[in-house]
Amino acid sequence: MVILLQFYKEENFKKTEIGEIPEDWEVRELKDILEVIRNGLTAKQNKDKIGYPITRIETISDSKIDITKLGYVEDIKQEDIAKYRLIIGDILFSHINSEEHIGKVAIYEGKPEFLLHGMNLLLLRPNKNKIEPYYLLYLLRHFKQKNIFKYIAKRAVNQSSINQTQLKHLKIPLPPLEEQKQIAKILSDFDNLIGTINKQIEVLNKAKKGMMKKLFTKGVFEHKSFKKSEIGEIPEDWEVVELGNEKYFKIIMGQSPPSSSYNKEGEGVPFLQGKAEFGNIYPNPVLYTNKPLKVVDDEDILISVRAPVGDVNIAPFKLCIGRGLAGIKSNKEKVDNFFVFYYLSYIKPKIEYLGGGAVFKAITKKDLESIKIPLPPLEEQKAIAKRLKAIDDLIEIKRKEKEQIEKAKKKIMNLLLTGKIRVKT
């Protein structure tokens, strides 16, 4: 509510070449509000951290400057250092990239303290007397969301590009400078809040990982004696079983029904081809089929058997599974599905490297059957799963909170950057 009190609805608009904008806004070309627009330094780079840090195309792949994705240059002239060193407020723009990444932007905020501008990213240096750098950052992100950069890009095989001339003549809405700063602050506040939630999720995931390591080796009950096993030391009363042990498990490999049977109208059985619709625990299928071939039931385990392999979910109801998935049914008198679900997610890295240590694009039924899991008594399985489910519930609450904030930010950003709502300055 505090943020909403800063807004008022605009009533007076004028027609322009980019659509309706408030009467006191301008339309300017990008070149008119920049001090510099240019490509980066062409130089031989290394990843051994020898020399000066320099940006690479992947440095901004997550729409921020990622200091773990930098290159380094050794031989460089002093005049090039002066020319290509980034200053706070510089914006990097991805103008040569796949269609998915074209138009991504990131702003330099001073970390690392010394950073050179490398090739395959354009530098946009705002004239701070005309435009607030963060306003321009959010405006360019807004344009990307609206697919403007996809529209103006020149397409080639696996790559798109936008030349400097096109970008220089890109027309942008320009509010008064003080309003730009207010818009940028509001959107930055949203980003800071999202960043805080991301850190909370990161802490919870780290705690979950540590909890898993302890629970799957020491258990949840007090154990006084332990034994060595093929998967490491475990409590004396635990077993080690393979997923291929029919006393405990049954594996169903997915098979895709005819594509003519697919629909989104809810006819037949919900259908999953692969892990695309996987959630944190449960999937959210969008397709249905009226000709199911391979079916799993409520609470059966789902595992991805095609790249990326090893991801797991729990079936929330009866589902048809395609060839990208397998289902694991458990003997419920001996096995708690959620315990197995959590253990498989814990050993996902090992599942990815099944067979000689190489990453496989697919795993077979035989591979799945060979996976060994610890099996405590059923009561302890349930207790372990309950503890892990509790922390997962906290993570899910945070994810939903983040999702709601992101939706609110997107809506408000659209209203602010089109002038439909204004900021009181």
Swiss-Prot record:
Q: Which GO terms describe its molecular function?
A: DNA binding
Entry-linked InterPro entries:
Restrct_endonuc_typeI_TRD, Restrct_endonuc_typeI_TRD_sf, Type-I_RS_S_subunit
Q: Which GO terms describe its biological process?
A: DNA restriction-modification system
Q: Which UniProt keywords apply?
A: DNA-binding, Restriction system
Superkingdom of this entry's organism? Archaea
Q: What does this protein do?
A: A putative specificity (S) subunit of a type I restriction enzyme thought to recognize 5'-TAGN(6)TGC-3'; the other subunits are unknown.
Family to which the UniProt record says this protein belongs: Belongs to the type-I restriction system S methylase family.
What's the record's remark on domains?
A: Contains two DNA recognition domains, each specifying recognition of one of the two defined components of the target sequence.
Protein name, please? Putative type I restriction enzyme MjaX specificity subunit
The protein's organism comes out as Methanocaldococcus jannaschii (strain ATCC 43067 / DSM 2661 / JAL-1 / JCM 10045 / NBRC 100440)
Lineage start: Archaea, Methanobacteriati, Methanobacteriota, Methanomada group, Methanococci
